Amino acid sequence: MHILGIDPGSRNCGYAIINYAPHVNSLKLIEAGIIKIKERDLQTQIMEFVEGIDLVIKNIHIDEVAIEDIFFAYNPQSVIKLAQFRGALSLKILQEIGNFSEYTPLQVKKAITGNGKADKTQVAFMVKRILGLKGEIKPLDITDAIAIAITHSQRIKTNDVHSTPNLQRAMPLKSLSANPSKGCI
């Protein structure tokens, strides 16, 4: 099974494809790289980003996709720009693959190192150790993408891939009404 891990960014997008064999619990790095996005107008940048993702998807058959979720940032403009890239990425993945999973940086760090507050060097060390890689992986966007793919493989192993742990219903879905007079939406 090929898992594509993506660390989206508005300047650099890290990606990694790992082969996961669940029956023998084996992980192997197939390909990893960076999609560099040049400083241009936003529409051109988004097109370059999507074209880069398209090349990755069309080059190797992908079974599962895992994307790092948007996290808190101090600059609202950066978050808005990243959200636009994420929207384009989400649409492309849905069109080509059919679905994807998302993981927060905290979830990835905890899955890879056991510590949700681990720094990037600790994550990089564990990624290399898990995959048995020698040498340094640069830039860290690639390491993050590999870590995201590994995190997804762990969720597959525990059959927890498509769960929604944050979803809590106060009442059964069938009892919700579209009638505003009843106070439900």
From Swiss-Prot:
Record localization: Cytoplasm
Q: Which domain of life is it from?
A: Bacteria
Query: What are the names of the required cofactors?
Result: Mg(2+)
Substrates-to-products reaction catalysed: Endonucleolytic cleavage at a junction such as a reciprocal single-stranded crossover between two homologous DNA duplexes (Holliday junction)
Q: How does this chain assemble? A: Homodimer which binds Holliday junction (HJ) DNA. The HJ becomes 2-fold symmetrical on binding to RuvC with unstacked arms; it has a different conformation from HJ DNA in complex with RuvA. In the full resolvosome a probable DNA-RuvA(4)-RuvB(12)-RuvC(2) complex forms which resolves the HJ.
EC top class named in words: hydrolase
Q: Does the keyword Metal-binding apply?
A: yes
Function according to Swiss-Prot or TrEMBL:
The RuvA-RuvB-RuvC complex processes Holliday junction (HJ) DNA during genetic recombination and DNA repair. Endonuclease that resolves HJ intermediates. Cleaves cruciform DNA by making single-stranded nicks across the HJ at symmetrical positions within the homologous arms, yielding a 5'-phosphate and a 3'-hydroxyl group; requires a central core of homology in the junction. The consensus cleavage sequence is 5'-(A/T)TT(C/G)-3'. Cleavage occurs on the 3'-side of the TT dinucleotide at the point of strand exchange.
Q: Which residues form the active site?
A: 7, 68, 141
Query: What gene does this protein come from?
Result: ruvC
Q: Which residues bind Mg(2+) 1?
A: 7, 141
**Species name for this entry?**
Helicobacter hepaticus (strain ATCC 51449 / 3B1)
Keyword annotations for this protein, in alphabetical order, are:
Cytoplasm, DNA damage, DNA recombination, DNA repair, DNA-binding, Endonuclease, Hydrolase, Magnesium, Metal-binding, Nuclease
User: Which family is annotated?
Assistant: Belongs to the RuvC family.
E.C. designation(s) = 3.1.21.10
Do the record's keywords include Cytoplasm?
yes
Listed under GO cellular component are: cytoplasm; Holliday junction resolvase complex
Q: Which GO terms describe its molecular function?
A: crossover junction DNA endonuclease activity; DNA binding; magnesium ion binding
- Which Gene Ontology BP annotations are present? DNA recombination; DNA repair
Q: What is this protein called?
A: Crossover junction endodeoxyribonuclease RuvC
The residues that the entry says bind Mg(2+) 2 are 68
UniProt cofactor note: Binds 2 Mg(2+) ion per subunit.
